[in-house]
Amino acid sequence: MPPYRSRTTTHGRNMAGARGLWRATGMKDEDFGKPIIAVVNSFTQFVPGHVHLKDLGQLVAREIESAGGVAKEFNTIAVDDGIAMGHDGMLYSLPSRELIADSVEYMVNAHCADAMVCISNCDKITPGMLMAALRLNIPVVFVSGGPMEAGKVVWEDSVKKLDLVDAMVAAADDHYTDEQVKAIERSACPTCGSCSGMFTANSMNCLTEALGLSLPGNGSTLATHADRKRLFVEAGHLIVDLARRYYEQDDESVLPRSIATFSAFENAMTLDIAMGGSTNTVLHLLAAAQEAEIDFTMADIDRLSRRVPVLCKVAPAVSSVHMEDVHHAGGIMGILGQLDNAGLLTTSIPTVHSETLAKALDHWDVTRTNSEMVHKFYSAAPGGVPTQVAFSQERRFDKVDTDREKGVIRSKEHAFSQDGGLAVLYGNLAEDGCIVKTAGVDDSILKFSGPARIFESQDSAVLGILNGKIKPGDIVLIRYEGPRGGPGMQEMLYPTSYLKSKGLGKACALITDGRFSGGSSGLSIGHVSPEAAEGGTIGLVREGDIIDIDIPNRKIHLAVDDATVAERRAEQDAAGWKPAEERKRKISTALKAYAAMATSAARGAVRKLPD
């Protein structure tokens, strides 16, 4: 049996000094020999998705200790992508994922912790912790802070649901008065929690359920609802059990790499496609798979996207449905249940909470069970009161939405679309692929051709859109915003939001080697690989070149002959692969270090040391 890692610092005469330091943290004689569990928190007052986590780490810690473990809490950083958006702060968002993964590794290995509970929530925090968990491969349970309630505002004599994106779009739309913009701003983000739609944070927290590393309801139970407290309490007890099973019973089935296998990654991506998750999840799953030493690639995502239907449409794809509605319909277990019915999942694999996913679905899918407890759990409703306090309300719907024909979650037979919610496109513009969230694309523009309007940065694109330089039929092309070229692969939420505000959301396309916020929708194609800074063809496109987009056939093509492309490449090789215009962008040493090691989006934008 493997020895407890913590014995390195708690046992032996030579560790008297280390034990002395442990005692100074509150440990007593009877604690030496118990599993030491790292409570990896991410509380910060900068981020609404994390503002309520301060006391939740200690809640988990108390449960760990009541179950016979020793809990030691530490914190990671957490960047709010919405606040960092639209300025140079966004350069730091994706690189922060690597810092989070590294910081977890540093703390856990430096102190020889035996297992972890990861308390995450927002965009880069869940992926960073997931990467660390698979890198370390010690028992882990994920529990996130939970989704925000959707905002609501009285608009033209009716109540309209809102989220962060509505505020951004309204601010750039001249049809809205200042008073109307303020009303939307005040209502868009009413509570603590991760932004209320199927944006990156909620997408990733949902995927931890499919990967088998979190408890049912983790992705969809509202941050404000009292039901969410149970997830934290159970996580504390569960992690002690998992640690004992591994270290005392030699049960390797509880390790992250035994749970998050290739099949589990397929399940997670299948879920992502079915629920129209954020395109950022592609980056993060590819990165996590590499940490797990699993050969899960863009080719696998492409394969899955061709056979998985869209079973759930959530904001930003539709404005009336948010995470609270997904939970009301049975949450992620409800979507996984329909995917299983369609034969699209591998359910023989284990989870942290059940022997197999199949058994978990039998217990937690509201269409399979009559359990009063399960149906009550998924009836949790928004409280409708602005708050930054977790577990502060107990409102419920009268009953769960089990309508799989016209409800929020559909069966395969009644799918919103038989074609998946995410697609990988290939062509001479993106030889290694690019990603589009098809769930957010109007059917009328699934095939689109138009002239390229070239911008060497997100900033210049925003000015071009707001100044009326973009016309219906144009393709906005933003380059040198990839992992290396940015550096940091900025999100393009402002350009997509401003296209909407100008009435161009269904009349234009946007292509970039950067990425998109989970809040983006429309014909927004990102992650173009290779990126411009790596010599990708996107760096050779010139103003007015025609680009053909064919989502049904998964193609993207620059309509320029090969000889001309070769001539341009030779010219660019001589001039150097850099933006044609100078950008007023301060690149710090930290960002330069990331850029020096960053790989392409097709590889998850992870770091790779030079050979």
From Swiss-Prot:
Give the EC class as a word. lyase
Q: Does the keyword Metal-binding apply?
A: yes
- Tell me the cofactor note: Binds 1 [2Fe-2S] cluster per subunit. This cluster acts as a Lewis acid cofactor.
Active site residues per record: 517
Record: residues binding Mg(2+): 81, 123-124, 491
Provide the positions where the record notes the PTM N6-carboxylysine.
124
Could you tell me the EC number(s) of this protein?
Answer: 4.2.1.9
* GO CC terms in record: cytosol
| Pathway as given in its UniProt record | Amino-acid biosynthesis; L-isoleucine biosynthesis; L-isoleucine from 2-oxobutanoate: step 3/4; Amino-acid biosynthesis; L-valine biosynthesis; L-valine from pyruvate: step 3/4
- Lyase recorded as keyword: yes
Reactions accelerated catalytically? (2R)-2,3-dihydroxy-3-methylbutanoate = 3-methyl-2-oxobutanoate + H2O; (2R,3R)-2,3-dihydroxy-3-methylpentanoate = (S)-3-methyl-2-oxopentanoate + H2O
Record function comment: Functions in the biosynthesis of branched-chain amino acids. Catalyzes the dehydration of (2R,3R)-2,3-dihydroxy-3-methylpentanoate (2,3-dihydroxy-3-methylvalerate) into 2-oxo-3-methylpentanoate (2-oxo-3-methylvalerate) and of (2R)-2,3-dihydroxy-3-methylbutanoate (2,3-dihydroxyisovalerate) into 2-oxo-3-methylbutanoate (2-oxoisovalerate), the penultimate precursor to L-isoleucine and L-valine, respectively.
Would you identify the family this protein belongs to, as annotated? Belongs to the IlvD/Edd family.
Q: What does the record note on quaternary structure?
A: Homodimer.
Q: What is this protein called?
A: Dihydroxy-acid dehydratase
